[in-house]
């Protein structure tokens, strides 16, 4: 089915044929509930121009999505709910800790965010013993608990009394078995009827057995040699996590570097103090003494096993749009979907360093990637790659971590490089705005401590072996004092302390700038003018044409990544191919990192590749929901628990996907991610349903593929009021 396309418009112009100045006609009537195949929008005949001087097109209202009048539903006065905010996309996994404090406060009316969200549970009434899950009925394995086992051992009793009936979705075929030829949930699968049979034994009894499909198993060969049976990679051994939890894992590189860093900090204070004393006394030998002290410090310096110039080289370009690290929403099924739609690079959800060091399973699970994320990216022939870049050794998936102390970041980086070596990069989150991390000194709090941030990144480079180190920052913490320009220069050249010790550049391979301050959050548009200034600065530094007053700060080539080139990515409000092209061509960034835009319409990556708007029909969008459901069952399992987990994360995505307003319903293009829509109805019932901001409708959509929710399943939306305000400031 060919996607519907729309012509690009200026903000002040209605949707019209720009060549003939004719309005685009609707291909679907507003009240039609029968969905037609999407197609290119018709254009009125240019031979009949409108010469009526009094027919003046209305101007686009600022801050409000320009929905065509025939699709708008009038709202009763005084019923407008509170608007959504988007901070949850960055830190929803950690909102529980914030909720602990919030729970102590005085009760308020139900508005704002649900910080203490609960999701209930999805479990069998009585579980099947693990010794029975994959075995034939009459050949069970030995149960290690014997008579004390609290699980069911009789297979027929379990299937009849304790397990809910099979799902009737997916044509009654288990999507895991259909893709792999074998279901990894065994008898617990909610579609077990599609891969089980009853056979007659030699003594005439009927035995239930699981069925495997050899042809499907042959087709499901791993795409990369280090992927496991379920098609995923980057899975740390359980023994390693146990050893980490028991503090039996040594981190020699991090420990040695941390000791050197502590000693160097004390020596640096002496150097600076002595220099000040000599300047006061007018000593002529202060330069010689400073050089001698510098050499002494360099002699004590621990040479890392891999210098930044020796690490694996990476590439970012106009043809490689990037999916941003998204907490909760950036799960494996969603990343897999975005890769399929054209995203070239992905990141894990933000992982906290301390839980990684402690071997906590939940944090290490964030490093799990699909095998499609382990393939090399698709780059254009003749792309401006750096010298030494080996495309065959590149990956698409990187990890993002957060830390508030250098030793935490270093130890986390060392264990990541040891147990998940197939990471493209390890990215340090220096932009997360949530209060929990900020108060602890992590996330965007590091922006206020540039020297500390430089030490952390330099140390991460020293212990990450061949994995490059990158960073994601914001403009600053406060609106009136952005510091990203100075910070970017420091992270590329090194600061005063580094030049004093002769350490060279910190070796950051790529830098991503979100064009907002922490204080601003999502209240205003991202500042791409500031991002452009930063891009110009980094370009000058990369080309070594910037006039550096202090020549001592010129970095040592050995400490520079990618042959002396630091890649620069822009982030903020990218919602169409026009936004992407404008940022790459005019803002000067190497590529764009897409966050909320991909959550609302993941086919944004397809639009970027095609260079045009894609007006996905409701059925096409629903097919993406079905894919997510299938990928979720492959990731979390097709048993009761896996179905519940898939439903929960599908609902999380639908809380963003419902914000999409189809292109065919808009009077003006381009669409803007910050615009708030009035209440609207779609071109058919399904389109209206998918645009609903009522979470009960989201649950209804999940039931199309995952069946009725478990009686104990609960879902609380992030916001107690989960619809847009009808009016926005002009």
Swiss-Prot record:
What's an example of a GO molecular-function annotation for this chain?
RNA binding
Known cofactor(s): FMN
Give any Pfam family that matches: Dus
Q: Which residues are catalytic?
A: 432 (proton donor)
**Stored PROSITE patterns:** UPF0034 (PS01136), ZF_C3H1 (PS50103)
Keyword entries, A-Z: Cytoplasm, Flavoprotein, FMN, Metal-binding, mRNA processing, NAD, NADP, Nucleus, Oxidoreductase, Repeat, tRNA processing, Zinc, Zinc-finger
Comp. bias (Polar residues): 1-12, 48-57, 111-122
- Which InterPro entries does this entry report, sorted A to Z? Aldolase_TIM (IPR013785), DUS-like_FMN-bd (IPR035587), tRNA_hU_synthase_CS (IPR018517), Znf_CCCH (IPR000571)
Q: Where does FMN bind?
A: 325-327, 400, 472, 514, 571-573, 595-596
| Annotated EC | 1.3.1.89, 1.3.1.-
Instruction: Kindly state which reaction or reactions the protein catalyses.
Output: 5,6-dihydrouridine(47) in tRNA + NAD(+) = uridine(47) in tRNA + NADH + H(+); 5,6-dihydrouridine(47) in tRNA + NADP(+) = uridine(47) in tRNA + NADPH + H(+); a 5,6-dihydrouridine in mRNA + NAD(+) = a uridine in mRNA + NADH + H(+); a 5,6-dihydrouridine in mRNA + NADP(+) = a uridine in mRNA + NADPH + H(+)
Family that this chain belongs to: Belongs to the Dus family. Dus3 subfamily.
Function recorded in the entry: Catalyzes the synthesis of dihydrouridine, a modified base found in the D-loop of most tRNAs. Specifically modifies U47 in cytoplasmic tRNAs. Catalyzes the synthesis of dihydrouridine in some mRNAs, thereby affecting their translation.
- The molecule here is called tRNA-dihydrouridine(47) synthase [NAD(P)(+)]
Give the organism, scientific name.
Answer: Aspergillus oryzae (strain ATCC 42149 / RIB 40) (Yellow koji mold)
Question: Gene encoding this chain?
Answer: dus3
